[in-house]
């Protein structure tokens, strides 16, 4: 195993920074809903990390989600779909360290066809998934029909 990526104790994520979006946001722990979906963060201006998965920077795919908008306007991941391959994502952790990731792909999928295996399956290196809603808003369900998923790999 590459020693640069050995997990640290108590390296829980506390803040995500995406310079290309001028984004700095706190990170809260998230659980799965009774339906088995990742719960959304409580606040439109905060992100959430799936606490049952890897901590950002550990082996495997860490997942951080955020809202695209709210009744009051744009939310924390409003511009997530504008990220390009090569953009940097910094995850500041409770132990004072920062895990740095480089984006390599962005996808949009219908929520009914969410790529669960590609998002949550084990990876060869520490990776990060950033997820928000996208596509058309369905007034009847009160939700967007798609998800935007950004894939990133740890570089430092």
Regions found by a protein language model. Give the residues of each.
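Solvent-exposed, non-transmembrane regions of membrane-associated and secreted proteins
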Residues: 1-84, 92-97, 104-156
């Amino acid at each position: 195993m590459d020693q640069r990526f050995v997990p640290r104790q108590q390296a829980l994520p506390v803040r995500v920074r995406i310079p290309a979006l001028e984004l700095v946001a706190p990170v809260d722990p998230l659980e799965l809903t009774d339906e088995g979906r990742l719960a959304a963060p409580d606040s439109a201006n905060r992100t959430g990390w799936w606490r049952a998965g890897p901590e950002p920077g550990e082996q495997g795919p860490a997942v951080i989600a955020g809202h695209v908008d709210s009744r009051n306007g744009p939310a924390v991941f409003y511009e997530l779909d504008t990220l390009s391959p090569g953009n940097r994502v910094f995850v500041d952790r409770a132990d004072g360290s920062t895990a740095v990731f480089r984006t390599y792909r962005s996808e949009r999928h219908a929520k009914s066809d969410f790529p669960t295996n590609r998002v949550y399956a084990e990876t060869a290196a520490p990776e990060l998934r950033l997820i928000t809603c996208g596509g058309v808003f369905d007034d009847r369900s009160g939700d967007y029909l798609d998800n935007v998923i950004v894939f990133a790999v740890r570089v430092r």
